[in-house]
UniProtKB/Swiss-Prot annotation:
Pfam families reported in the protein's UniProt record: DUF2465
Highest taxon, organism lineage: Eukaryota
Species of provenance: Homo sapiens (Human)
Location of the region described as Disordered in the Swiss-Prot/TrEMBL record: 313-349
Chain's gene name: FAM98C
Name this polypeptide is given: Protein FAM98C
Length: 349
């Protein structure tokens, strides 16, 4: 009973996707799989639009069909052979559909609907990407920025492989194969983790209002972070500039700038934390640990904590050390000021 309900729900979802894409509803013989000409024709139309929009990597001759429906005796075999190649090219995650015996897989209950659902999702994503490229007025990034971004992705991938203990893949390894190896390794290590260690921090489903609220909160935090970081960077600039006031710094000024400028250029006020980090965060991130606890200090203490500052010159400026102000200077008056005209006493001899 539950399987029938699930298949009915899947059929309704596929019908809704097809209507949104501008195609007709699900053919009545979708359960018959590749043996149904209407089912093959619908798959052919979906694959043809994918090829037109440039979603396929393999180059084909002009006028060549990605899938052929056909009506002859060998039409079903040709369709299944071409379908297997198409699904592998699109990196379909459904192993049953990409296997060798495609005819038997499509005869299983719900297999035809799964195939249509996958093709519809690929077509929806391709249309969105094409629409984004048409509506985005911003210019394409230059080659240098793309190379830097690609280098960052490669660095993240290297760190992931090192953390999992996997060797670096050989040049030319397909991304799908690498992701499968990562998935297999993570699935192997997951049972050894404590229970609940992979629980997401954000467990509720996000609808449109929640997405807007999350984006607004993220923007507010980024603005506040930028304001605070600008203040810290300004204090850093003032502190480093104070080192150039001494007599010794005049001779070592170029060497000091050669060390400080590359480090300072990396420090930007913008934050690199995005909503993707929030979605990838785990529940243990919300645990508040005292910064002075023994476990935390074991990981944060370093040798510089034991270094004592030497004697530094006293800059003064204390209120109790301030001297009274100097009286203002006044010129002499013309009358010579007050005079005393009394009788003077004679000095004794």
């Amino acid at each position: 009973m539950e399987a029938v309900k699930a298949e009915a729900w899947e059929g309704a979802a596929v019908a809704q996707d097809l209507l949104a894409l501008g195609y007709g509803g699900v053919p009545g013989a979708a359960s018959r799989g590749a043996s149904c000409p209407d089912f093959r024709g619908l798959c052919v139309r979906l694959a043809a639009e994918l090829a037109t929009l440039g979603a396929l990597e393999q180059q084909r001759e002009a006028g060549a069909e990605v899938l052929s429906a056909g009506d002859g005796p060998g039409a079903e075999e040709d369709f299944l052979r071409q379908l297997g190649s198409l699904l592998r090219e699109l990196h379909c995650p459904d192993r049953a559909l990409c296997g060798g015996d495609g005819a038997a897989a499509l005869r299983e209950p719900g297999a035809g609907l799964r195939l249509l659902r996958f093709l519809c999702s690929e077509l929806q994503a391709t249309r969105l990407l094409c629409l984004r490229s048409l509506l985005d007025p911003s210019p394409r990034p230059p080659l240098g920025e793309g190379v830097v971004e690609g280098a960052g992705m490669v660095q993240e991938l290297d760190l992931t492989l090192q953390a999992l203990g996997l060797p670096r893949p050989a040049p030319g390894t397909p991304a799908s194969q690498l992701l499968q190896e990562l998935h297999a390794k993570i699935s192997e290590l997951q049972p050894s983790l404590p229970p609940g260690s992979l629980q997401p921090l954000l467990s509720c489903s996000l609808d449109a209002p929640r997405w807007e609220a999350l984006e607004s909160l993220s923007q507010s935090l980024r603005d506040q972070y930028r304001c605070r970081r600008c203040l810290l960077l300004k204090r850093l600039d003032l502190t480093t500039s104070a080192f150039h006031w001494s007599d010794r710094a005049e001779a070592q000024g170029e060497a000091m700038r050669a060390v400080l400028i590359p480090i300072r250029e990396v420090l930007t006020p913008e934050s690199d934390i995005s909503i993707a980090h929030v979605l990838a965060a785990r529940a243990d991130l919300s645990c508040l640990v005292p910064a002075t606890s023994v476990a935390v200090r074991r990981g944060t203490c370093c040798a510089i904590n034991k270094v004592l500052m030497g004697n530094v010159p006293d800059r003064g400026g204390r209120p109790n050390e301030l001297e009274p102000p100097m009286p203002t200077w006044r010129s002499r008056r013309e009358d010579g000021g007050p005079q005393c005209w009394g009788r003077k006493k004679k000095k004794k001899k």
